[in-house]
Amino acid sequence: MSYFKNLFNGLLSGLKGNNKEAPFYYWEEYSCMSALVPENYSLTEEVFVNIEALDGIKIKYKKLPHKKTAGKLVISYERKDFEVGFFLGDFPVHEMRHWEQQYFTEENKEKISSVKKSLNIFMKFEGNSQKCYYLQLKLIYAMIPEMVALFDESAKKLLNKKWVELAVKSNLLPDPINLFSIHAVYDKNEVWLHTTWIV
């Protein structure tokens, strides 16, 4: 968690209008995902154009990241408003292999291994978690369809780009199992199941 905690320091404060450090429990409030970006990727106003082209989504406020302040979107979706924060940051891809839960070809793995940065997107879920997860995937794919892969930090899953593409183009909501992971945790001769997710 320390990597994402460091990334969020000061960025959530920019979104919230204060200068406090991001709380360690930020992952309990925000669904956090990181799209692994290809080399020479740049974040431009085009992301807003792509989002505005999505059916059923209306942008009410938009701002690109500036210095140490996260970018911000306020969107209307199914009669609800959602705040979405986003920013580019360095990405420690060597830490992600442990969370690989989908199939990746050797070519996929080579591309992932060469990634140095990610587009990080965080939002609060309001109402139906499946619909919010689907919305976040649609926003991310619209912002960066050329992503190399997607790391869902809240569910601790490294997702194949093709899976993301199929999910956002489907008329069906992702299965609930996609929203969480269950891990076996061992400590002091005891084993228990640990769940990571955002609801």
Predicted feature locations:
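N-terminal alpha-helical "arm" segments
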Residues: 2-52
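Catalytic micro-motifs at enzyme active sites that drive phosphoryl/nucleotidyl and oxygen chemistry
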Residues: 21-24, 63, 104-111, 128-129
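Short, flexible beta-strand-to-coil junctions
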Residues: 37-41, 122-130
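N-terminal low-complexity, intrinsically disordered segments
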Residues: 39-109
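Structural alpha-beta junctions
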Residues: 53-62, 141-153
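Well-ordered, non-membrane alpha-helical segments in soluble/globular domains
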Residues: 98-104, 129-140
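Glycine-rich, often proline-containing surface loops adjacent to acidic residues and nearby aromatics
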Residues: 111-126
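Aromatic/basic-lined ligand-recognition segments
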Residues: 155-199
